[in-house]
Regions:
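Alpha-helical support elements that line or immediately flank enzyme active sites
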Residues: 309-340, 528-540, 586-602, 606-609
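Terminal accessory carbohydrate-recognition/targeting modules of carbohydrate-active enzymes
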Residues: 1-279, 291-293, 297, 301-304, ...
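Extended glycan-interaction surfaces of carbohydrate-active proteins
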Residues: 79-83, 208, 261-305, 329-371, ...
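TPR repeat positional signature
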Residues: 314, 378, 382-385, 462, ...
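Aromatic/His-enriched, Gly/Pro-containing loop or helix-boundary segments
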Residues: 97-109, 159, 197, 348-379, ...
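Inter-helical turn/loop segments and adjacent helix faces that build the functional surface
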Residues: 388-400, 471-487, 593-600
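Hydrophobic or amphipathic alpha-helical targeting/insertion segments
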Residues: 119-131, 384-398, 405-411
Length: 693
């Protein structure tokens, strides 16, 4: 094991506690004062913008603060008891401070659930009685998460009312309108079990406290959100000790390995962390049943349903069980496009890209309450239906999903197919410009680093349609739809031939990023062709050269495959899609290397990812990290400034990498599990328990 002291953490200045739709984001001291992205958020709405405990108007000194798990947190704070003599300054070896020798302790315990519960415990560890005012500063603004970013202006103009109700409830009520839309949200902070009566004055809840030596004082605060404009989001406290996914945690596959000096303990740590993170990102309000659920894409920015993200995460994590695939497929089927609505980039059959519940989306300042601007989601949906079939062989479970899968393919053929390939463009005034795998505004550049404007047919989108047709044809054959199965099978073969002819660049030994509006190759060297390997669209004679190009120095950082070649003028190791490294991509690429028997490439990619995981707190890979070269000057990668962590598809990438190393693939319709392990020396042994096929 490494004795390195490197421990990386995204968002190093913010502490997060989260469960479901609720996120508590504080400064490093456990409090917050209305700063950027800090507060208690429920459904992307900042219900509490200021929260700070004081003793006689003075701050507490934090001495130990930590998450207990993703949904709970505890902090220790101390001060010298008010009125106590600080005494002489200590100059001995202990360098003792007065507040550590005569201590008034504040212990805060928080659990996030449907809302928040905070338990407040005071203990007088001094040898004299003390009297003081304990107070907490409270503020609320009901800002959308996006409005809390530094430099962002507030768009919604609502009415906020505040009221105090005896014996101890502080209520905030907020209403806003925009066009025909309106929201009605609120928060009650209820004081329970208080050791002395509360008082509300000048933005503070205060208590008069008297403590004898060794005595304690307690109160509990329940934060009860009200989101009346959303169905199923009502008033409820945080539920102490509630596990968001108990059945999954009991039944999901688990992993172990003997202790050794190899990477094996890191692999196990990363696997078990990923397993927990996926459960912690669960969105209970979207549950389709105890064994059928989906998750948010990532914390803190993506606590929402993102179609392609959760489709990817659910199939990559299939080794854990089918619950996520089942719940995700059903949740998206319920939200499949039905009409032509250019504002939302919606068309019949198109699969949802994202669904937000914050004020700006619900009020219609943007189309994100239900937005369809992704080509990838519709291509992925049939693939994941097929994966669910391969893992379960359950006709009753899969058959209702066939219709939505076919409609998603028909959408691609009707709205995205052009001249034999599949492209994208937005029709919305606030739509996503790039709607393929890489969807940031500057993601698509040519070999000179110049932006390319849609319509664009990217290489990976052709691969996704290919594998969707191929896998769905097999499933339709099983279901007796043989004519449609034959049609899709032949279409897949024809697309593969056209793709290899049109996208291959012989002089580069690689595939073009895409075809532009004039169907000219976009000749930039990117990670996108790695997805083509994963999907199996690459002709056999081109596989070795394609894989080798991904591992040349300009593409391989030493921690993973970069999104864009470092030789491209637009390369930036910090850019979202122009030079960074994404664990989710490298997880998919691993299955591509396995598909073509490239075990050396698989081992290299896997080792790099787990060596990266070793550098991060809890072995938790973030959404994306920088593409700096791994060398003596760069002993660890930087982190993309806005990276989510945990991120669903970074967690699933870890599971996917191990599945590839184990050579596991299920075929439940034939009651078959294929196992062809190629474990490297850094992972000599691995035990999987509870695998369900």
């Amino acid at each position: 094991m490494s004795d390195s002291l490197i421990r990386l953490r995204p968002w190093p200045d913010i502490l997060y506690v989260s469960q479901g739709r609720a996120v508590l984001a504080t400064d490093r001291d456990g409090f917050f004062d209305g700063g950027s992205q800090r507060g208690l958020f429920v459904h992307q709405t900042r219900l509490v913008s200021r929260w700070r405990w004081l003793v006689d108007g003075r701050p507490w000194t934090p001495v130990a603060l930590s998450n207990v798990d993703q949904g709970s947190w505890m902090g220790y704070y101390i001060v010298l008891p008010p009125g106590a003599d600080p005494g002489e300054r200590d100059h001995g070896s202990g360098h003792m401070k007065a507040d550590s020798e005569r201590t008034l302790e504040l212990r805060l315990s928080r659990r996030v659930g449907d809302g928040l519960r905070e338990d407040v415990d005071l203990t007088n560890f001094s040898q004299q009685a003390t009297r003081f005012t304990l107070a907490v500063e409270v503020g609320s603004d009901f800002a959308d998460l996006a409005e809390t970013f530094e430099g962002e202006e507030r768009q919604q103009k609502g009415e906020l009312r505040r009221s105090w109700r005896e014996p101890g409830e502080l209520a905030f009520d907020y209403r806003a309108e925009h066009g025909q839309a309106q929201i009605d949200r609120g928060l009650v902070i209820r004081i329970e079990q208080a050791g002395s009566p509360p008082k509300w004055e000048d933005g503070r809840i205060s208590f008069q406290v008297e403590l004898a030596p060794g005595a304690s004082w307690h109160c509990s605060l329940a934060f009860l959100p009200r989101i009346s404009d959303l169905v199923g989001a009502g008033l409820a406290p945080a539920r102490e000790g509630v596990n968001p996914a108990p059945t999954f945690r009991e039944e999901a596959a688990s992993f172990s390995t003997p202790e050794s000096e190899t990477l094996a303990p890191v692999v196990i740590g990363a696997l078990m962390r990923a397993r927990r993170d996926l459960a912690d990102l669960r969105l209970p309000d979207l549950d389709e049943g105890e064994r059928s659920w989906t998750m948010a894409a990532g914390l803190p920015l993506y606590i929402a349903l993102y179609g392609r993200d959760v489709l990817t995460a659910s199939w990559q994590a299939g080794l854990l069980g089918p619950e996520m695939m089942d719940g995700t497929l059903r949740a998206l089927a319920r939200r499949q496009g039905t009409v032509v609505d250019d504002w939302r980039d919606e068309q019949p059959g198109r699969m949802l890209h994202e669904a937000h519940t914050g004020p700006l989306a619900v009020l219609g300042f943007n189309p994100r309450a239900r937005y369809y601007g992704s080509a990838t989601t519709s291509g992925f949906y049939p693939v994941v239906v097929s994966e669910l079939w391969h893992w379960t062989g359950d006709r009753e479970r899969v058959r209702p999903l066939l219709g939505p899968a076919l409609e998603a393919l028909r959408w691609l053929e009707r709205y995205a197919g052009d001249n034999g390939f599949f492209d994208y463009r937005t029709r919305s005034s606030q739509g996503t410009v790039h709607q393929a795998w890489k969807d940031s505004p500057g993601a698509i550049v040519d070999e000179e680093g110049r932006p390319v404007e849609p319509p664009i047919a990217t290489c990976e989108e052709q691969a996704f349609v290919y594998v969707a047709r191929l896998h769905l044809s097999e499933l339709l054959w099983w279901m007796g739809e043989k004519d449609e199965a034959k049609r899709l099978f032949h279409q897949a073969g024809e697309l593969k031939k056209r793709f290899n002819d049109a996208f291959w660049m012989e002089d580069e030994g690689f595939f073009a990023l895409g075809l532009d509006a004039q169907r000219r190759p976009i000749r930039s060297i990117t990670s996108n062709p790695g997805h083509c390997l994963a999907a199996g669209i690459v002709d056999a004679e081109l596989v070795e050269r394609t894989a080798a190009r991904l591992f040349e120095d300009d593409m391989w950082s030493g921690w993973g495959v970069r999104t864009l070649s470092s030789h491209n003028p637009a390369f930036n190791p910090y850019s979202y899609h122009r030079g960074s490294v994404w664990p989710v991509e490298n997880g998919s690429f691993a299955l591509g290397f396995l598909r073509y028997g490239l075990h050396d490439r698989l081992e290299t990619a896997g080792r790099a990812m787990f060596e990266a995981a070793r550098l991060f707190d809890h072995y938790r890979l973030p959404e994306v990290f920088s593409g700096h070269a791994r060398d003596a000057a760069h002993p660890f990668p930087a982190i993309y400034p806005q990276a989510n962590s945990p991120q669903a598809w970074s967690a699933s990438a870890v599971i996917c990498l191990v599945q590839a190393l184990l050579g596991i693939y299920p075929y439940a319709p034939w009651k078959m599990l294929l196992v062809d392990p190629h474990l490297p020396e850094w992972l000599p042994e691995l035990t999987v328990r509870g695998l369900r096929v």
